[in-house]
């Protein structure tokens, strides 16, 4: 059955860090999805994720507003690119990477879709809380 998810029906959670908010529309918990996750993600100016990957899940990101910086490679920082409003970014399954809001003053807003039923995040850097390999809430 087709399902419409209105903004008020999305599940809002903190993302990978306090400066990231996920407004989850499609996931296993929201609509019973078995193979698709889709959310609007807002990141505060200057914020960035920890070094991570998404396991076997491919990721599509559409930049709605702002400018993003992505780094990737064996340690998550060897290569770099920026993406602006209107750009799509593809992140292959297993790609170790970091996402950052490249602006010091404007929020970054993206639509993120992944071919798995939840956010599926695997951290590699230990982070400030020492919580390696703990998936983010979906």
Place the predicted regions along the sequence by residue.
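Residue-level recognition of conserved beta-strand positions in structured domain cores
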Residues: 40, 53, 72-74, 101, ...
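A short, N-terminal "cap"/entry segment at the start of jelly-roll beta-barrel domains
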Residues: 1-36, 40, 50, 121-138
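Short strand-connecting beta-turns/loops that link adjacent beta-strands
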Residues: 31, 56, 75, 104-105
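A short beta-strand-loop-beta hairpin characteristic of the jelly-roll/cupin
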Residues: 48, 57-85, 95, 100
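Residue-level signal for beta-strand positions within conserved beta-sheet cores that form or flank
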Residues: 34, 79, 106-107
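Conserved hydrophobic/aromatic beta-strand scaffold that supports enzyme active sites
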Residues: 22, 38-42, 60, 80, ...
């Amino acid at each position: 059955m087709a399902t419409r998810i209105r903004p008020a029906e999305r599940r809002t959670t903190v993302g990978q860090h306090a400066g990231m908010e996920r407004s989850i529309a499609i996931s296993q918990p929201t609509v019973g999805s078995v193979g698709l996750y889709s959310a609007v993600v807002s990141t505060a100016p200057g914020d960035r994720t920890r070094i991570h990957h998404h396991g076997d899940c491919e990721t599509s990101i559409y930049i709605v507003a702002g400018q993003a910086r992505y780094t990737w490679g064996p340690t998550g920082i060897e290569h770099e690119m920026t993406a602006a409003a209107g750009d799509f970014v593809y992140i292959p399954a297993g790609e170790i990477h970091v996402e950052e809001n490249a602006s010091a003053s404007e929020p970054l807003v993206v639509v993120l879709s992944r071919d798995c039923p939840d956010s599926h995040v695997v951290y590699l850097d230990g982070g400030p809380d020492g919580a390696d390999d703990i998936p983010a809430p979906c």
